[in-house]
Amino acid sequence: YNIKNLILPLSIFLIGLLDLIWYSAFKVDNSPFRATYHSYLNTAKIFIFGSFIVFLTLTSQLKSKKESVLYTLYSLSFLIAGYAMYINSIHENDRISFGVGTATGAAYSTMLIGIVSGVAILYTKKNHPFLFLLNSCAVLYVLALTQTRATLLLFPIICVAALIAYYNKSPKKFTSSIVLLIAILASIVIIFNKPIQNRYNEALNDLNSYTNANSVTSLGARLAMYEIGLNIFIKSPFSFRSAESRAESMNLLVAEHNRLRGALEFSNVHLHNEIIEAGSLKGLMGIFSTLFLYFSLFYIAYKKRALGLLILTLGIVGIGLSDVIIWARSIPIIIISAIVLLLVINNRNNTIN
């Protein structure tokens, strides 16, 4: 087998293995951090199993020959948008979560599925940018209903990256698609002006509170978690530590610096940044495993000229800057499934020249 086909499965397997080792080393009965341990155990199972599926996909000649499969994937965003519209008609003005978790989690899942859905149409014979942007419109509609700031900022950037990668040799199509994307974004802003404005004002208030030593806000708590997580890592960069040990360190730091108290609410969850979370629990090995995964995704996307995998990777890395998605069950399943689907789709033809 070509060595390049081992890099991505190995990076996925490494994360799963480290999570399993960490769980086995520190999980005890009746732990107050049971949810945290089981979230990592679920990720370990999914990534270890998923690494073999990804390896088989990379080393096989499996192709998606029928375009009907691509159109089925393309329809996913519209099905999600339709369901979101129905939920919104019942619970108007609430952040939608599809009843399966948080609104933020729903946004991340929708964006990752939307990337697969949008990229699928670019591999068909009717790969007009209008169809891609129609998908983007459906995804942005759902993201606006979740009112998740990170995805509302990140997804348009991903759309632009996809258009540049796919239509860079067709200036006319590229220009018209960018103009249409701007029009779609403007429409979303106009339609959802009130909730977007509210979330924007909340962000400004959160930042203002944080500068005034109050981190008990959404953004303030994130910034406090980043500071605490880095502090914990720097004190012992080569060590694994339990969830209990990390929480104890968080409490000690807050006792010294009360302005960081907003982070304590999430001591039994995660630190809302992939690198900081990995470093705070698994030290340098945790950070290396996360960066290795990112590198492997970009590397395979480049080597296989896989537009879809490149765009998905941008989404995974982008979300990882402000949250943790390599965690728990649902989103890791989506990530592994998306990688496999995009690799299979890419076997039809190459799209990055």
Located regions from the model:
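Long extracytoplasmic/lumenal interhelical loops at the membrane interface
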Residues: V216-G220, A224-E227, I234-K235, R241-K282
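Alpha-helical transmembrane segments of multi-pass inner-membrane proteins
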Residues: F49-E92, A103-N168, I191
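A membrane-periplasm/extracellular boundary helix in multi-pass inner-membrane enzymes
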Residues: Y166-N212, L230-I234
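Transmembrane signal-anchor hairpin modules in multi-pass inner-membrane enzymes, especially those
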Residues: Y1-F26, T57-E67, Y71, I121-F130, ...
